[in-house]
């Protein structure tokens, strides 16, 4: 039988392995995002509270922030905006994670298997995993930056309504169109530098930790490549990713949400370094960990749901384990 005919008989996952992995990771990310999104919204609102730089614009939000703490913030959203507002911005978040998760997973596996090369005994040095995780995060996040920008800005719409400010967007597609009209293509990549910095750190924590812990457990303990190993590995990856990524996440959220002039330039911060300095000087070092608790409480179950779902649908689709 000709080679072309044999290829046609192969399952789709073997004929288009990277496309399949992209789609499978997108499906797993969608499940995880829907399950944990309220914590992401709460985290974003917390990160914006007490933003010292707003005082330069005479914004009263600094003194009138209605919430303090994770629980009161979440309850306040439910009481004042409605229960379903806990999922405000979930549509662009799903768009973002399909692109982001698909991009990072395909990139990481390509680097691991082809560029750096895992040894025959499945040993993969930590330093290679760190570099691979960071590079995968950078590429995945750069591709997904427009959707992340829309998600962050839509998450703050409920707060604007409470402060008596006009809403900026009528929906997801209007948000994309408005940002594009006001800032051009470059406007869709506002905040991309702190965004990829955060993604590099988060994926160094998530991908590197999961891959390293999982294969350590499989190779050095009685545990097999099953749901127990996946669960333990994802718990570790969620914690490390939250610790490494929260400061960059605070900076990213503030830069993306800041008001802009007619040229699309930020009115509060010149760069991610400027935002970092202003936050520490105006609010203290711990301001970089605003929203850490909901971030950790979200990252851990998100990581668990994602990895358990991803490993399972890979198995069901005939794709080798991660």
Curated annotation (Swiss-Prot):
For biological process, the GO terms are: inner ear development; intracellular triglyceride homeostasis; negative regulation of mitochondrial calcium ion concentration; negative regulation of mitochondrial membrane potential; negative regulation of neuron apoptotic process; positive regulation of cell population proliferation; regulation of D-glucose import
* Single annotated GO MF: protein homodimerization activity
Q: Which GO terms describe its cellular component?
A: apical part of cell; mitochondrial inner membrane; mitochondrion; neuron projection; neuronal cell body
Matching InterPro entries, A to Z? Mito_Metabolite_Transporter (IPR050391), Mitochondrial_sb/sol_carrier (IPR018108), Mt_carrier_dom_sf (IPR023395)
- Membrane topology label: Multi-pass membrane protein
| Quaternary state and interactors | Homotetramer.
Job of this protein: Facilitates proton transport across the inner mitochondrial membrane and may dissipate excessive proton gradient associated with oxidative and metabolic stress at neuronal synapses. Regulates glutamate-induced proton conductance in astrocytes, shifting the energy metabolism toward aerobic glycolysis and lactate transfer to neurons for ATP synthesis. Can transport chloride ions with lower efficiency. The transport mechanism remains to be elucidated.
Q: What is this protein called?
A: Mitochondrial uncoupling protein 4
State which gene encodes it. Slc25a27
């Amino acid at each position: 039988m000709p080679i072309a005919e044999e290829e046609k008989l192969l399952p789709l996952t073997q004929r288009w392995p990277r496309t399949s992995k992209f789609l499978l990771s997108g499906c797993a990310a969608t499940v995880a995002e829907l399950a944990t999104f309220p914590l992401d919204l709460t985290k974003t609102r917390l990160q914006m509270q007490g933003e010292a730089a707003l005082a330069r614009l005479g914004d009263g939000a600094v003194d009138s922030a209605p919430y303090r703490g994770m629980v009161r913030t979440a309850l306040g959203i439910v009481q004042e905006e409605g229960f379903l507002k806990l999922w405000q911005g979930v549509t662009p978040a799903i768009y973002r994670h399909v692109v982001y998760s698909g991009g990072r997973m395909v990139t990481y596996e390509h680097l691991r298997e082809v560029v750096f090369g895992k040894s025959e005994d499945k040993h993969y040095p930590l330093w290679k995993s760190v570099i691979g995780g960071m590079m995968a995060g950078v590429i995945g996040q750069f591709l997904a930056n427009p959707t992340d920008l829309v998600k962050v800005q839509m998450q703050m719409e409920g707060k604007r309504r409470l402060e008596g400010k006009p809403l900026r967007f009528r929906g997801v597609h209007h948000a994309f169109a408005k940002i594009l009209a006001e800032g051009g293509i470059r406007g869709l990549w506002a905040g991309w530098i702190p965004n990829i910095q955060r993604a590099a750190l988060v994926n160094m924590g998530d991908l590197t930790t999961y891959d390293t812990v999982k294969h350590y457990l499989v190779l050095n303990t009685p545990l097999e490549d099953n749901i127990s190993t996946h669960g333990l590995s994802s718990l570790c990856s969620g914690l490390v990713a939250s610790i490494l990524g929260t400061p960059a996440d605070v900076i990213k959220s503030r830069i993306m949400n800041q008001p802009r002039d007619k040229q699309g330039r930020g009115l509060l911060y010149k760069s991610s370094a400027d935002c970092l300095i202003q936050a520490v000087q105006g609010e203290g070092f711990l301001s970089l960990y605003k929203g850490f608790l909901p971030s950790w409480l979200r990252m851990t179950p998100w990581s668990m749901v994602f990895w358990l779902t991803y490993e399972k649908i890979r198995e069901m689709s005939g794709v080798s384990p991660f």
